C-alpha cells in the first residue's frame, strides 16, 4: 500500500498506518502467509470494527480481520503479503474456529 500518509505524515511502521478502510476493499481476496518452508493461502473473510466506545481516545478505530485457511496453525506472528500492499505485514494470528471447511483466524489491530 504505497503512499499511506495517515497521522499527519508521520513516519510510522506500516501496521500502525493501516485502518479498517485499508482492508475492506480486500475482503474476499487472498493473502499469503509465509513460513520458513511454505506459502499458505488465506482468504480475508471479514473486517470488523471493535470497541467503538473507546475509539475516540485512540489513534485509530480498533478493528479485527478474519481469515480462512486450509490448515491448522499455532497462534503466533506470521508474515502476510497481498498484491494490494507494497510491504509485507507481520500479524499476530489466533485460531478462533475450525471445521471441515477450514480454520478461522483473527488478527486484532488496536
Sequence positions of predicted segments:
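Acidic, aromatic-enriched beta-alpha/helix-loop junctions
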Residues: 52-84
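Conserved hydrophobic positions within beta-strands
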Residues: 44-46, 93
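Short, compact, well-ordered microdomains
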Residues: 77-110
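A generic structural signal for short beta-strands and their flanking turns/coil linkers
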Residues: 27-29, 38-40, 59-63, 74-76, ...
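A glycine-biased structural micro-motif
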Residues: 20, 25-28
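Short, conserved beta-turn/loop elements at beta-strand boundaries and strand-helix junctions
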Residues: 48-53, 97-101
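Short coil-to-beta-strand transition motifs
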Residues: 33-43, 82-89
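Short, Lys/Arg-enriched N-terminal segments with co-localized hydrophobic residues
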Residues: 2-13
